[in-house]
């Protein structure tokens, strides 16, 4: 297996999307998908507690953490999503003695706490000194962001798909890692909790897929508003549905990343 670095690439993004997609399929299917073949991952660990589920893949050079996203039928997941009230953040692992700065979404913090101790032990035994990559979709994206913040490895990288906002500006400004945030057009989850109650995104490099699946790099409120109108009108007229929920599909994120990777390889 090749080493994954901390620079953004569509090859890395597609692999992270594949991981996040299969995290919904349960432990057995996940292991089957990523351990097969001569280039399969031989060391895959699974952790679960209180509704929070996480896979960790390790090799000599990489340490990859994958959080499962929201299961609509799981009360624990729904409860984590709707607890908007902010609390002070946890201390970062590699910043012992440093005052914690910023406030974090209470539900996401509680969901990560359910599994934090065992994840921290595993990281200390198997992850230090390796390139850390963290990923997830929806609730999983929020947990991936907070996990990377707590580990506090400045070289770590987080790929998030359809991530909600996780905390206030002070929290985000003091996060010491790189986050590549991917958003599919009108994905409604990326707009909650709302900005007007003090939430913001961790996003060092936004990759925004417009209504036609074309990538726009960076944040532009005007451009995205235009795409919101276009996407909403198109789906209401054509499909009689609202695309805000359909655009949150992890399957669509995976397809969009693969399409971009193929396009990039053809151009090269």
Where are these regions (language model features)?
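Non-catalytic, mobile gating and regulatory segments of ester bond hydrolases
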Residues: 1-135, 139-268
């Amino acid at each position: 297996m090749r080493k994954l670095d901390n620079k953004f690439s569509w090859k890395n993004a597609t692999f992270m999307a594949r991981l996040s997609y299969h995290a919904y399929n349960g432990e057995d299917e996940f292991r089957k998908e990523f351990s097969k073949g001569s280039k399969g991952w031989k060391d895959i660990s699974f952790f679960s507690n209180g509704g929070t589920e996480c896979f960790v893949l390790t090799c000599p050079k990489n340490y990859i953490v994958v959080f499962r996203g929201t299961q609509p039928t799981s009360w624990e997941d729904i409860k984590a999503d709707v607890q908007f009230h902010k609390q002070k953040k946890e201390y970062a692992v590699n910043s012992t003695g440093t005052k914690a700065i910023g406030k974090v979404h209470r539900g996401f913090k509680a969901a990560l706490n359910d599994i934090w101790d065992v994840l921290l032990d595993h990281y200390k035994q198997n992850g230090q000194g390796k390139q850390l990559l963290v990923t997830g979709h929806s609730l999983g994206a929020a947990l991936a962001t907070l996990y990377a913040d707590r580990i506090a490895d400045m070289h770590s990288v987080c790929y998030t798909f359809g991530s909600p906002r996780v905390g206030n500006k002070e929290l985000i400004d003091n996060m010491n890692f790189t986050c590549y945030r991917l958003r599919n057009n009108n994905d409604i989850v990326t707009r909650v909790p709302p900005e007007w109650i003090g939430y913001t995104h961790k996003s060092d490099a936004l990759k925004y897929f417009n209504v036609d699946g074309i990538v726009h790099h960076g944040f532009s409120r005007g451009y995205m508003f235009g795409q919101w109108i276009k996407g909403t009108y198109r789906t209401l007229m054509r499909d009689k549905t609202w695309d805000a929920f359909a655009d949150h599909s992890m399957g669509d994120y995976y397809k969009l990343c693969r399409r971009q990777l193929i396009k990039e390889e053809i151009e090269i």
